[in-house]
Amino acid sequence: YSNSSYDIVSKNDKIYIIPGGKSLTGDNSFNKAGSVMIYDYEKWSVLEPSVVQNKLNTWPKDYTSIVVTKNDTEKEIIYVSSFGYGLFQFIDREPSAVYNKTNSPLENAHGNEGFYCRVDGLAFDKEGNLWMTNSEVSKAIKILDKEGKWHSLSVESLNGKYTINDI
């Protein structure tokens, strides 16, 4: 458990909390280990960072936003954005994917190598598409549609900006 909660959401009679954050001074992180804490009104459960690292070969940290949905087969899908590590996906509380510049249109800030895939502002539209912001890049709005296809939008007033938050 953590006393460093950064985002909280209530969905499906559960409460989901993530520690994390982002710096306003330009450095990459607060170095908060990425866990997802879930309270189902009876008990707490935690999706531990070590499990994510072992399964996805990426250390999760500096989470910035969380959204929860269900897929067509009623499996719980959790998406968590990170300020440096991209977008994490959990299916039925198991780490299933991390999206970054190697496997999606998500970009690293200013084309830097390493852990600069700065994602925030997760939100679903009424069709079930996942929208997000991608800071300090040429196309600041990214969309993962319900079919699993990625789309990028260029919004001149947002492109290249630091710490874009919610959509």
Go through the PLM ranges and name each one.
Residues 1-167:
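Carboxylate-rich, polar loop motifs that coordinate divalent cations or form catalytic acidic clusters
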